Amino acid sequence: MNLHEYQSKHLLKKYNIPVPASEVVFNPDAAVDAAAKIGGDRWVVKAQVHAGGRGKAGGVRLVKNKEELKSAVKALLGTRLVTYQTDERGQPVNQILVEQTSDIARELYLGAVIDRASQRIVFMASTEGGVEIEKVAEKSPEKILKVTIDPAIGLQPFQCRQLFFGLGLQDLKQMRSFTDIVMGLYRLFTERDLSLLEINPLVITGSGELICLDAKINIDDSALYRQSELREMRDTTQEDEHETMAQQWELNYIKLDGNIGCMVNGAGLAMATMDLIKLSGGDPANFLDVGGSATKERVTEAFKIIVSDKNVKGILVNIFGGIVRCDLIADGIISAVKEVGIDVPVVVRLEGNNAQLGAKKLADSGMNIIAAKGFADAAEQIVKQVGVIA
């Protein structure tokens, strides 16, 4: 789950991590009141969306008076911001962060992720702040400093100092501030079950202070059951509507760009199914794992989600019955076809627990459902059917 910048900074404040004074607003008049509360005569207006690249897309603006402020907020609210990280529709702008300006002398990058290889939290720092860290990693990986955290003892102050001096910094007052910031970020990361934390940029002001100018936080979805405060921060308007619908039925769904819908039980089999579709000349429209405890109702809802994608021209159902019974899957398929009125080809491959019974139910249903003879045949059949439609 992703947080907005204003939500991320709210958390940073709780951990005594310095951020600029700011207020989130939902209408132009509130922006003027927010500016008066913040003080000063110049402010930064930031569109709140779950995507990077806002500045280049016009979503971050410097305003020099309250008339400009009100105009900028009015121009952004209610629009959809398209950046290099969004699709062509962009993300809806429903909130604006009004923030005090900062006297920036230097920009740095600071971040933390869970490294899958070492199975530990890794903190990263770079002198290349204010730009996409992915580009830095690609072009100049040597400019990214890393420290790996031992979970038995946690982040140690000497590791913070390693990063500090590695950035070419020397001032002792800044070293103490930097150490406090990194230690606070580590506590935030571990206590709130984060999967990603980025401060980009971490700025050094003209007076030598360190301030977190922007913040990005991702939370581990599997930990939301014990993070009630963070769970309430979820903004479903920023998420794909199909994925939101799938979460309500405990379905693992990820939308892709192809035109062949996939419904599979098991993440590994789902990925293999998508691979085989590609090898057969097709393009999968989604990843959808109904899980090992699929019910008739969940299968029906899975079909609804798949066909709600207007790009889908055919559906491949690939089920290996272990825990899940193939006859239950067949019941769900029949129910979905009747309820939703599916008018695209459906190819089904059933193997394992009650596969013969499931195949018989599909055959006796009288519906135009194509039974596949095997895994490879299923992929070839659906690619062929979609090709005929195209």
UniProtKB/Swiss-Prot annotation:
What organism is recorded for this protein?
Coxiella burnetii (strain RSA 493 / Nine Mile phase I)
Entry EC number(s): 6.2.1.5
The record ties this protein, via PANTHER family, to: SUCCINATE--COA LIGASE [GDP-FORMING] SUBUNIT BETA, MITOCHONDRIAL, SUCCINYL-COA SYNTHETASE BETA CHAIN
Sorted UniProt keywords: ATP-binding, Ligase, Magnesium, Metal-binding, Nucleotide-binding, Tricarboxylic acid cycle
User: In its UniProt record, which GO terms are filed under biological process?
Assistant: succinyl-CoA metabolic process; tricarboxylic acid cycle
Give the binding site residues for ATP: K46, G53, R54, G55, E99, S102, E107
Q: How does it assemble?
A: Heterotetramer of two alpha and two beta subunits.
Name the UniProt record assigns to this protein: Succinate--CoA ligase [ADP-forming] subunit beta
